[in-house]
């Protein structure tokens, strides 16, 4: 009898937990993020500094900044006006070209960084 009650409670708990989870959509704040290639192209015709937010999928502080710092309307307006804002995943496996130099992830182990995130 106790096993049935425990099993039922466990199923209810897991069901409620699943309902409370997000759909996987990431909160990207109010900043108009673009990729690094687009930022470099735009910079050729309208020069502005490129602001690179380096993040990882597992970084709690990165997510906190997205919810708070980059969701501040005043700061987002300032960044969108005076910078080309780029989000860069530090663990990307893609080779990235920035300022005519190529950066790669040498895949040195678990959670290995792309060289652009290390400079």
Set out the residue ranges of the language-model regions.
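Second-shell loop/turn segments in exported
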Residues: 24-29, 102
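Detector for the c-type heme attachment site
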Residues: 63-67
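Thioredoxin-like thiol-disulfide oxidoreductase module
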Residues: 40, 73-119
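Bacterial Sec-dependent N-terminal signal peptides
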Residues: 1-25
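A short beta-strand-turn-helix
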Residues: 31-50, 79
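Short Cys/His-rich "knuckle" micro-motifs
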Residues: 70
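Short active-site neighborhood of thiol/selenol oxidoreductases, capturing the structured segment around
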Residues: 46-60, 85
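Extracytoplasmic/secreted cell-surface and envelope-processing proteins
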Residues: 60-62, 96
